[in-house]
């Protein structure tokens, strides 16, 4: 229904999806129909993509895969007019696969708070940056690596998201994982985070 609703808005419709796999025939059929009616569709899919875009000449469809050191499992679905004419956001466990949609118990949760929606917009914005390393599905249905030749932290979407989230929490007064010791973290819960961040950023996010 959400895809069909965007389709009714034609060229004003917009759909953004971040998932691991896009396989379900029914969902793909709906997306293709929406694309042919002018809906702008952005698909960030880490793994399997069964949708072909070679037959969608002139359609506003972008498909990319963004990989990194972490095996991501987050799903984000955004529909420009899905909430009484305003953007609707969902996060959850389900990929657009028949096994997820028809054979399993999965959860999709609507995101209502403006702050949380802004977080999702930020993540999607980073994933669609032009200066990150990614693979893109071309109109001839082949995957092409694009972005900087060298895969460095600066051009790693996952690293950029981690850095942004860490800096945001620090700016709001959260305890810095770089400063933890036995006195500030007696339970030891933050020490693994400190070790991970040190490996990624060096001794600190500005190192």
Task: Give each language-model segment a name.
Residues 1-207:
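PLD/PLD-like phosphodiesterase catalytic module centered on the HKD motif
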